[in-house]
Swiss-Prot record:
Thiol-specific peroxidase that catalyzes the reduction of hydrogen peroxide and organic hydroperoxides to water and alcohols, respectively. Plays a role in cell protection against oxidative stress by detoxifying peroxides and as sensor of hydrogen peroxide-mediated signaling events. This is Peroxiredoxin. GO terms for cellular component: cytosol. Homodimer; disulfide-linked, upon oxidation. InterPro entries: AhpC/TSA, Peroxiredoxin, Peroxiredoxin_AhpC-typ, Peroxiredoxin_C, Thioredoxin-like_sf, Thioredoxin_domain. It is an enzyme of class 1 (oxidoreductase). Belongs to the peroxiredoxin family. AhpC/Prx1 subfamily. It holds the Pfam family 1-cysPrx_C. GO terms for molecular function: thioredoxin peroxidase activity. Residues 6-166 form the Thioredoxin domain. It comes from the Eukaryota. The active site is a conserved redox-active cysteine residue, the peroxidatic cysteine (C(P)), which makes the nucleophilic attack on the peroxide substrate. The peroxide oxidizes the C(P)-SH to cysteine sulfenic acid (C(P)-SOH), which then reacts with another cysteine residue, the resolving cysteine (C(R)), to form a disulfide bridge. The disulfide is subsequently reduced by an appropriate electron donor to complete the catalytic cycle. In this typical 2-Cys peroxiredoxin, C(R) is provided by the other dimeric subunit to form an intersubunit disulfide. It catalyses: a hydroperoxide + [thioredoxin]-dithiol = an alcohol + [thioredoxin]-disulfide + H2O.
Length: 200
């Protein structure tokens, strides 16, 4: 599967861009800064919208859970870093983000969202809700792109990262709905019977 220049099993498109950091400062960050860690990189259409703050706040609130497993979360939209800062300075009860624990990238030139296949131009002036899981070697492992009215599930994203990390470490594969501690499958015709023999 591919989205723009982003292709499963290949290095994720690199970038350097201005971001609002958790301390409220502006900083240029690059995807290469995160090599050695897993990354959840998600796009949302615009600041000061409706579903977006619920997603971003949920990712921010879960940032420590991701960090515990060696994963960083980065959000991005086509708004400026000044707009991002204004949104983080707006109270949540007024539709703002409040204090953030994750960086928000300003893709004002739309080059990053184009490379990741979530910005197509035309009538839609903002990116779709794309989410990308990138492993510690910088390789793209998962792509999800959805329309805007429905928010994403942070718990499911955390589960997917844990599953990819498990397969990387142990060489076994994870069945549907796998969670840490549950059974996995040895990718071998004979050895896989250990798993399937337990099924009802």
């Amino acid at each position: 599967m591919a989205a723009g220049k982003a292709r499963i099993g290949h290095l994720a498109p690199g970038f350097t861009a201005k971001a609002v950091m958790p301390d409220g400062q502006f900083k240029d960050i690059s995807m290469s800064d995160y090599r050695g860690k897993y990354v959840v990189f998600f796009f949302y259409p615009l600041d000061f919208t409706f579903v977006c703050p619920t997603e971003i706040i949920a990712f921010s609130d879960a940032a420590e859970e991701f960090r515990k497993i060696g994963c960083e979360v980065i959000g991005a939209s086509v708004d400026s870093h000044f707009c991002h800062l204004a949104w983080t300075n707006t109270p949540r009860k007024h539709g703002g983000l409040g204090a953030m624990k994750i960086p928000l990238v300003a893709d004002t030139m739309r080059s990053i969202s184009t490379d990741y296949g979530v910005f197509e131009g035309g009538m839609r002036a903002s990116p779709t809700g794309g989410l990308f899981i990138i492993d510690d070697k910088g390789v793209l492992r998962q792509i999800t792109i959805n329309d805007l009215p429905v928010g994403r599930c942070v718990d499911e994203i955390l589960r997917l990262v844990q599953a990819f990390q498990f397969t990387d470490k142990h060489g076994e594969v994870c069945p549907a709905g796998w969670k840490p501690g549950s059974d996995t499958i040895k990718p071998d015709v004979q050895k896989s019977k250990d798993f399937f023999s337990k099924q009802q």
